[in-house]
Amino acid sequence: TRKQITILLNGTAHGPALHVLLYIPNHVKRPAVFVGLNFWGNETINADPGIFLPTAYTEATTGYSMNTGPCLDGHRATDRCRGMAHGKWPLDMILKRGYAVATVFRSEVDPDYIGSFKDSVKAYYPELQNRPDNFSTIGAWAWSLSRVLDYLETDHDVDASRVAVFGWSRLGKAALWAAATDAVAEAHRQYRRDL
């Protein structure tokens, strides 16, 4: 089962939002959930045409065994981006083994390019900007993982007491930070393991 959930971070449709893509195996009741951010958009982890295309800035890259340039239109996702990162997301294996998967596109939180402050959730919290403990891009990503965990606690189709946050590269650092600051999260340092 696929769900797409919009989390309104300030309670209004005009404020910042996270678009959570949640896959739940049909053969398990209330499965544990793997939660992680993705680099290039929810639509890239699976070719499913029903996944909403993001409107957030999408990085054009030729690194990480990816070439997102041809699928983008001015740093915005198109249908050509669908399934591009499916090899990095073993959805079928995870679902078959009875686990759920939730992900959010990291650029909806903070696109992390020079001058991206205005497109980041950080812009909605100006009172934090001059403090020594102001949150960085990785901190913002970790914060968003905690918001996904908050949502999962309200979803009766999954077991929010059994959650593992994951990520690789800088998104792995965000997962570790979320695990360190959120009592529900449990860090996992590899994204692929024998489940």
Predicted regions and their residues:
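Structural recognition of the beta-strand scaffold that forms the well-ordered cores
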Residues: V33-G36, V101-F105, A164-F166, A187-Q190
